[in-house]
Amino acid sequence: MTAADLEEVIAIESDSFPRPWTRDHFLAEIDSNRSLPLVAKNREGRIAGYICSTHVLDEGEILDVAVRRDCRGKGLGRMLVTTAISTLTARGVSSIGLEVRASNASAIALYRRIGFETVGLRKNYYENGEDAFLMAYTINDSEDRADAV
């Protein structure tokens, strides 16, 4: 992801979330050495989805992921998440966490299919009082690390 991608990224973000990230938030992720902001483009060169993840020492976190509405249900979200896992694993991460709205059944199902487990709950986490599930993915041993790359 680069600053040139932000117009399309912000449009997807605004369509996907009730409280979207701002341009400044995305710019901070682009500029951070620990962040891994990635975009996926379609054949026409339009951004179809993106993911922002970060890492500190051996812990990674998926911060934001969204797929353009007309591209959903085609495996792009899975590809973005598994690419982030592979990239974070290559950087020495042994676990990856994320927070997801309790009502976001499709995202929760996707994360579970990939191997994330629900490990906690943040009550009233979002502005509207909605809870967030805490989910985690663990890279168990060197074999898993090699497979993830």
Predicted regions and their residues:
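Short hydrophobic clusters on alpha-helical segments that form packing/core surfaces
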Residues: 84-88, 96, 107
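Glycine-rich phosphate-binding loop
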Residues: 75
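Conserved active-site tyrosine of GNAT-family acetyltransferases
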Residues: 111, 116, 135
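Residue-level recognition of the GNAT/N-acetyltransferase active site
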Residues: 68, 72, 101-103
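C-terminal "cap" of GNAT-fold acetyltransferases
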Residues: 94, 101-105, 124-149
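Acetyl-CoA-dependent GNAT
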Residues: 3-70, 78-91, 120, 138-149
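Conserved short alpha-helix immediately C-terminal to the canonical SAM/SAH-binding motif I
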Residues: 80, 104-107
